């Protein structure tokens, strides 16, 4: 069953496509159900005989696999690009490895292309676009009959424009066709109101050959020394100490909120596995890795 916002957004997307406009940008808060929305739009386009095939692109293999399962379930068919399949779910990275025959074959069909987490791809023109943005601009954009861009966090730390996005002016606000905010999601009970407690190391020391330097926070350490952020987060003692602080804080919070959980943002999957091992073996916590 669709949520109200998904039903509303799908209807607006179909209306725009049927009005001979080919692109739709949906910004919805993380966890709201954007993949199910995209699959529903694809289902309606197929039912209306407006498309023949569906292609989905996303940042990681795990996300691409999740999209494949959702589309296969919603469309009641295989979604692996094989014989008899209605489409395929791929990563942005894989675009550059698809041969010319693949693209020539697609020109014979009406294709609906879904770009998940589109903010990972930057550039309004080939010049200045990042690698993924260039692939979209050069190979995908002109091929698609209809495109759907999805993002939970539609901004970039480098301030570059998001590929296929429209802005009010060169330095202006991103224009989207549909927005489902965290505030709306909380009101609809789609998401819970986040209550976040941050943990920082309030007493860091660096021991050199001649002196011992102390700092009141990680930020102060980074500003006043040549120490890199990477060297801190991969340091075994630092990791164990901060994870210990976090576990103690979580234990105190759970006295009032038994369902509270802890979140550790890792630098990579390998880093996450190392953190998970410390949490399980040294702090006796249950821990799962998500990407």
Regions found by a protein language model. Give the residues of each.
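SF2 helicase catalytic motif II
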Residues: 104-149, 153
